[in-house]
């Protein structure tokens, strides 16, 4: 039978090493307005359909958070009926959390964005602002603008002369891009819509040893706010052949990264055993969506590497075993390294990826649901300014240390 948990006891649980999940069942707009940091949004109407995907082990402690105690308790009862044996409800609901004086934060995909701002302070990642980039483009000096967003975002609007390379593809394709004669000695600028994916993309290229890399401060929003214009309707990234030399460079860089960061590999047979255990396990396919649809490990989530910062609505148990999968090692290692830096404690990479899985005699599933990237919907200049100020403020606590 579900039991209540007091707000301060939930704080203790969330700070512990015990695998658990905190599921906020309020409407998403309420979650965006105020939330418990690292909780996972799952509106009550989606509970039956998605709870087992979010919480892969039904024996884990799981706390349901509604606006009120009645909402929380009802959701915990529903979770128990779905087979979750340790469902709890937050006493007095989200309002009780607030009345206890405990912190909340607003926004969507906050943990990933918080990580990006922390990275910017602690590494740091060199930036370039919109006016500096515009001047560099007009100077005639070689500059490459790599847009790390999804193809759909790029096609809606992009920086003039930008090239769409979704973030997870950057390590694979950068060697080919730099090999073009016109790109000799070029400055490489990585952009997104705002800040996070620009920072992470530039950081990963830096770690590969790529020179003259910059993150575009505030992305396309900052570009517009600086009075610049965006192109519309240009073709985004499409599948294409990457040279063996570029793939080899990515694999070499990934292996060095794994050694430096302590990223561990797992063999296909061991992953198959892990999936059959009682431990919470997420298999995360970090390839591009068309690759996932063509064939993936049963039960795998699709999180293309560039969208990793925004995957918090799929990984509800932060202390679970996470295994990244690609078509070899490179993309899996780059993704696993970021997840480790974000604070996920148990991340490994399927050694050899999908080819190794099938070579070991294991089958693939085909098809599935491609999850579209859902941005924050910021459209007005006032909204852009407010959003960027909010995002920058996430890093203030790290700068003060």
Where are these regions (language model features)?
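Rhodanese-like catalytic fold shared by cysteine-dependent sulfurtransferases
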Residues: 1-21, 25-144, 148-282, 286-401
